[in-house]
Amino acid sequence: MARYTGPSTRIARKFGEAIFGDDKSFEKRNYPPGQHGMAKKRGKKSEFAIQLMEKQKAKYSYGILEKQFRGLFKKAAASKGVTGEILLQLCEARLDNVVYRMGIAPTRRAARQIVSHRHVTVNGELVNVPSYHLKPGDKVAVREKSKSLEAIDRSLSNSSHVYEWITWNTAQMEGTFVSVPARLQIPENIKEQLIVELYNK
């Protein structure tokens, strides 16, 4: 299945929450999409449907396709620790996500474009792979020739997010992936254990 590129508000309404961040359109219409959205009731779902919905929410939130997401789950399952928590930590360590968390881009979708269009470096080297896995201590910066881009400047000016596991120097337009975030430091409203149960069926 191809990556979804349609209206983010429609997907947010499907899950009943603003999974892509602040969304004024969602706030106005926070009911299911479709002609009869207002009349639809979020009725009782089966266990499988609930687990599947949670997996879809995570994939949409991070902008990850099924093959990549399953690969991350396998890596998490093979690691020591709580599988669901490690899965989210792997998602958070992706370059596109960190670019978003640092405020270089207003959304993860925009962050993927910024990375793909060669506007970001990691430890001084140009990296254009959104799924690139960062390690603690890695330095992420806006490429010198891209520092004057209006879209990046506007995003940084509007960013108010502060995370303990990353640092950002506005003057140098450079930040550091200090550490892998603990589960409590990840703000996403995702019930990762449901995803683990789904994949373990």
UniProtKB/Swiss-Prot annotation:
Q: Which terms are listed as keywords in the entry?
A: Ribonucleoprotein, Ribosomal protein, RNA-binding, rRNA-binding
Give the source species: Flavobacterium psychrophilum (strain ATCC 49511 / DSM 21280 / CIP 103535 / JIP02/86)
Q: Which family does it belong to?
A: Belongs to the universal ribosomal protein uS4 family.
Q: What's a single GO CC term here?
A: small ribosomal subunit
**Database matches in NCBIfam families:** PRK05327.1, rpsD_bact
Taxonomic lineage per UniProt?
Bacteria, Pseudomonadati, Bacteroidota, Flavobacteriia, Flavobacteriales
Where is the S4 RNA-binding domain positioned along the sequence? 93-153
Task: Give yes or no: UniProt keyword rRNA-binding.
Answer: yes
Protein's name according to its UniProt entry: Small ribosomal subunit protein uS4
Oligomeric state and interaction partners are given as: Part of the 30S ribosomal subunit. Contacts protein S5. The interaction surface between S4 and S5 is involved in control of translational fidelity.
Its domain of life? Bacteria
Q: Which GO terms describe its molecular function?
A: rRNA binding; structural constituent of ribosome
Any single biological process term in GO: translation
Describe its function: One of the primary rRNA binding proteins, it binds directly to 16S rRNA where it nucleates assembly of the body of the 30S subunit. With S5 and S12 plays an important role in translational accuracy.
Q: InterPro entries under this entry?
A: Ribosomal_uS4 (IPR022801), Ribosomal_uS4_bac-type (IPR005709), Ribosomal_uS4_N (IPR001912), S4_RNA-bd (IPR002942), S4_RNA-bd_sf (IPR036986)
Which Gene3D superfamilies does this UniProt record tie to the protein? Ribosomal Protein S4 Delta 41, Chain A, domain 1 (1.10.1050.10), RNA-binding S4 domain (3.10.290.10)
